[in-house]
Amino acid sequence: MHYCVLSAFLLLHLVTVALSLSTCSTLDMDQFMRKRIEAIRGQILSKLKLTSPPEDYPEPEEVPPEVISIYNSTRDLLQEKASRRAAACERERSDEEYYAKEVYKIDMPPFFPSENAIPPTFYRPYFRIVRFDVSAMEKNASNLVKAEFRVFRLQNPKARVAEQRIELYQILKSKDLTSPTQRYIDSKVVKTRAEGEWLSFDVTDAVHEWLHHKDRNLGFKISLHCPCCTFVPSNNYIIPNKSEELEARFAGIDGTSTYTSGDQKTIKSTRKKNSGKTPHLLLMLLPSYGLESQQSNRRKKRALDAAYCFRNVQDNCCLRPLYIDFKRDLGWKWIHEPKGYNANFCAGACPYLWSSDTQHSRVLSLYNTINPEASASPCCVSQDLEPLTILYYIGKTPKIEQLSNMIVKSCKCSKTKLAAFARLYHSHSNLGSET
């Protein structure tokens, strides 16, 4: 009686586990490509937080040079990052996740010895410039895992608007008059009159560049989303030809008098209160001893990337080329740049060495009966993905966005779920025999 109850419980539990396993059914290549294209359509709209493509408007005759400049510099940054990773054979991500990180704080140096603030004569109404000296960390440049820029937004009761969208840019060294002068990093919508708060931005790529090329450290620029007009974040509405000043105020950057009203005693008290809120960088680095202890001669698996897959005819799991033309494949005209991109996808068989546990005929039979569409073998899935930068229009307004995980660069065979299923089956079976 006890054994029957246990068997029923085992079957119910295995049914639940099997049904929860991801399926990996075989598809012909044409069908797979069609599904991949539709998945990309959904991905782009979802990442842009759109429920449907924007309405089609006539394409602008000429995109403003400053917009093209930001798009090109952001795109080039991603390409440089990919090239560095490929050329340097970066350490496996598992090392970065496993080892403890050493954290370093680098404060923004004061503009003047007596007061870390911009005096009225240097006041810039539309943007702020922030610089850091990271030269002390250059010797550990290869150990950098992450860098964050943190700045404290102060309450500004004098603000004329309740909220603004501020953007962070890396200032670039101009090679000539046509080269870009800044590179977009990130943006945030802030409440100008609300209580103060810390704002954090991921600036890993910028700091990595500074550590390797000291002459490129020109700092960051905090500016408005649309300084030549007025941008309303709540409804994304733009009022043209009405310049908007940066109403957000930042500790250690803006002079106390620009956001505080009152006598000298009040101003001094406010300055003291914000003295420990200087803009700073937080650098997270792998400790040197952790790197030295690693075995440098570990055998690495062959990468199933373009370098291997595109020059070999493979039936097994490999990277497959797929170019998406936005107009032809998706019927979209609202993405201005690029016209398309190499999305790629993973497909092919994954040879599997069956263990004695998983080879058990009863295990296979039960697994296939419970979920006939599930694959007992590993699936060919993406391993490395890269972002895509797009320049698109909503109405007549140009926007630049970076979409994460849009380009498949390499593939792998996922670990089979059948092994876990078999272990669960045998553990319950052994429990039943003991009973």
From Swiss-Prot:
GO terms in the biological process aspect are: cardiac epithelial to mesenchymal transition; cardiac muscle cell proliferation; cardioblast differentiation; cell migration; cell morphogenesis; cell-cell junction organization; collagen fibril organization; dopamine biosynthetic process
Q: Where is the signal peptide?
A: 1-20
Matching InterPro entries = Cystine-knot_cytokine (IPR029034), TGF-b_C (IPR001839), TGF-b_propeptide (IPR001111), TGF-beta (IPR016319), TGF-beta-rel (IPR015615), TGFb2 (IPR003940), TGFb_CS (IPR017948)
Cysteines joined through disulfide linkages = C309-C318, C317-C380, C346-C411, C350-C413
Q: Which GO terms describe its cellular component?
A: axon; extracellular matrix; extracellular region; extracellular space; neuronal cell body
Which residues have a glycan attached per UniProt? N72, N140, N241
- Does the keyword Transferase feature in the UniProt annotation? no
| One family name in Pfam for this protein | TGFb_propeptide
Q: Does the keyword Protein transport apply?
A: no
Q: Name one GO molecular function term.
A: signaling receptor binding
Q: Give the matching PROSITE patterns.
A: TGF_BETA_1 (PS00250), TGF_BETA_2 (PS51362)
Which of UniProt's keywords are assigned here? Cleavage on pair of basic residues, Disulfide bond, Extracellular matrix, Glycoprotein, Growth factor, Mitogen, Secreted, Signal
* Subunit record text: Interacts with the serine proteases, HTRA1 and HTRA3. Interacts with ASPN. Interacts with MFAP5.
Q: Which family does it belong to?
A: Belongs to the TGF-beta family.
Q: What is this protein called?
A: Transforming growth factor beta-2 proprotein
Question: What organism does the UniProt record list as the source?
Answer: Sus scrofa (Pig)
Q: Top-down, what is the taxonomic lineage of the species of origin? A: Eukaryota, Metazoa, Chordata, Craniata, Vertebrata
